[in-house]
Amino acid sequence: MRYDFQSIEKKWQAYWNEHQTFLTKETVDKPKYYVLDMFPYPSGSGLHVGHLEGYTATDIISRYKRSRGHNVLHPMGWDAFGLPAEQFAIKTGTHPKVITEKNVSSFKDTLMRMGFSYDWNREINTTDPGYYAWTQWIFLQLLDRGLAYTSEIDVNWCEELKTVLANEEVAEKVADGHAVVRKPLRQWVLKITAYAERLLSDLDLVDWPESVKQMQRNWIGRSEGVEIDFQLPCHRTSLKVYTTRPDTLFGATYLVISPEHPMAEKLATAEHLIEAKNYIEEAKRKTELERTGLQKEKTGVFTGSFAVNPANGQALPVWISDFVLTSYGTGAIMSVPAHDGRDWEFAKKFDLPIVEVIKSPHDVEEAVFEEKGSVCINSSNDDISLDGLPFETSFGVMADWLEKKGTGKRTVKYKLRDWIFSRQRYWGEPIPVKYYEDGTLRPESDLPLTLPDIEAYEPTTTGESPLANISEWLYGTDENGSFRRETNTMPQWAGSCWYYLRFIDPGNTEKPVDPKKEQYWMNVDLYVGGAEHAVLHLLYARFWHKVLFDLGVVSTKEPFQKLFNQGMILGEDNEKMSKSRGNVIPADQVLGSYGADAVRLYEMFLGPLEQVKPWNTNGIEGVSRFLSRVWRLIYPEPGSMAELNEAPLTEDLTRTMHKAVKKITDHTEQLKFNTAISEMMVFVNELHKSGSRNRTAVETLLLLLSPYAPHICEELWEAIGHDTSITEENWPLFDPALAADNEVTIAVQVNGKLRGTVTAPAGSPKNILLDSARKEESVRKFLDGMSIIKEVVVPDRLVNFVVKPG
């Protein structure tokens, strides 16, 4: 019998479907394991090989955990609302609903061909009214708690897309070539800032890549500083400025306010008013990226007004510049050009004074000095002296003095801004509120408020969504009077903010999720997806989850316990796959040529899961040859089947088998799938070399390989006499004594702190241990950019690098 992967894979996919093999049991007598993919947006271009990487990884873990006795929840669904589907619909002239249904069918077919062990009974779609009824319900809970509000605000408007973009979305759209401008619009906004501190502190509760945590910390942008009142004598008022460096107050030589600051025009004197107004209007046509880019030349206008420095009484000119944003701090800054790069550039351009107040090793007229590790100079008056004090002391001394004088107050600020939640488009969840003639706003009482089927779904030129043109849907009367519905829709992120909960209880019509089921399954044990979602989906979902926690809907503080970011698979030209480059490798194409098992194995064998790596067709052919070698263990020749023997294993083969089980178990647990596959290849080679067709060894191999290449393992498991699926078998165990490989685990420290471990043969020389330690990924990031000044090696136990900034 030859290895006919096409018929074998169809056979076992049909078997799993018919027998509901991967149906998740509603039982609590087993330990649970919830493994989740970031569910896809079903695009018209279909899945390519890069998309399959994360799905393959989660499927391996799902199958592995089932074999270890876990009750596994491994679902799949579709994030189908939003701009991409609508843009494609406009481009092709096909209704987004029709496109979505077609694309979902195509995606599902590919995923099923890959043999992924999803429980398809739990499939969800964000465009299903039964699903988005609960998305709308959550919105109304936000509204009820004062966390959703409307506001006339300056927004990021994309004229080409005819919609508002959230701050987090602007960079992506600009990179795609869309122009984005600022304009005032009435918007629905979610008060994510109310949860800023919890979003920050609770990052300590989760096992996420440090890089993603840091991206969220930077986006939230917590800072401790002081709000200082600068008196404006000519206006009989003051200008409030927020600074994180009150210790440099004596070095402030001018103030800058944003063009949107409410006092911008008021502070402009008659001779400067026209110039100020023109500058303010020009700033409205720029995006924040254009205004704040580090390489952007500084621009600004002088208002003609002066403020008083409370530390030394000096008059400080007040300028308007677009590098200052109203959305952060107070929209006004004190400029200390000697010790801030932007302030120094601005001062140089407009010939403003530069005063050194932090002792610098060079002339601050020639270059800025921004380090905190020095001491204050030129910083004293009759009441206070900071001279000679380091930052750690001078900050508090100045803050205390300002608070005592009543001209300053310690405060905490965040860069995070409230989430602009409404979109002026058709293809999204309707926002379930009604506006009455008496000016009141009331929630829809009957959910879901369904999206009407309309023919003209293109965006309008008025700033309202196409729903504003559907009068029979838009207007109505009830017991409270005549009303007009909200025409904005929710953004594409809404449905993905809580989908992980709906998978737990997808058919519930009474609640978003049953409390007992939620308590059993939450939180998600392993969440796999791209790091590009760090400050979009991942932040939004954490926010909604915390609101639901406060409502008592969920029992955990965080939704996703462990996050793993898979690396991108590039095209064969080493570039990101894209239609424009012509380097996209469609999933269906390689499935037809090589089969699911080969694709699954190759995707995982390419390299470490977290790393970026290029596709190589020669590589998948090598994996196909490996599967053929596995096949020949049972079918050494076409038409002939080997007879497995029941004799005891030789001592060498016994040790080989137990070592393989141990290493493959460890590597699978750690998501080091490429090295697990390498160990399987070694094991197969040993089986062929030994010439032994030992049943125990062959069955052990099939059990180890089955999460990775399930179809061929099912077929061979049946061929050697089993009448039940291999999915019902337990994972093989190993004897530690037989698996011992004379290897030791070496702790690797950097400046005395444990940063990772490496394994090496006992007695390895110093140079081997140092080389292994330097290459260990968890260690390497602490060595990058550093100078190693000493290397300490304790044989078989420890490596310590003593480093300093290099």
Swiss-Prot record:
Binding site for ATP: K579
BP GO annotations: leucyl-tRNA aminoacylation
Motif ('KMSKS' region): 576-580
Catalytic activity: tRNA(Leu) + L-leucine + ATP = L-leucyl-tRNA(Leu) + AMP + diphosphate
Single GO term (MF): leucine-tRNA ligase activity
One annotated Gene Ontology cellular component of this protein: cytosol
CDD domains per record: Anticodon_Ia_Leu_BEm, LeuRS_core
Chief localisation class: cytoplasm
Coiled coil (residue ranges): none
SUPFAM superfamilies, A to Z: Anticodon-binding domain of a subclass of class I aminoacyl-tRNA synthetases (SSF47323), Nucleotidylyl transferase (SSF52374), ValRS/IleRS/LeuRS editing domain (SSF50677)
Keywords for this protein: Aminoacyl-tRNA synthetase, ATP-binding, Cytoplasm, Ligase, Nucleotide-binding, Protein biosynthesis
Subcellular location: Cytoplasm
Renumbered ranges of motif 'HIGH' region: 40-51
Keyword Protein biosynthesis: yes
EC number assigned by the record: 6.1.1.4
Family: Belongs to the class-I aminoacyl-tRNA synthetase family.
Protein name per UniProt: Leucine--tRNA ligase
Source organism (scientific name): Chlorobium phaeobacteroides (strain BS1)
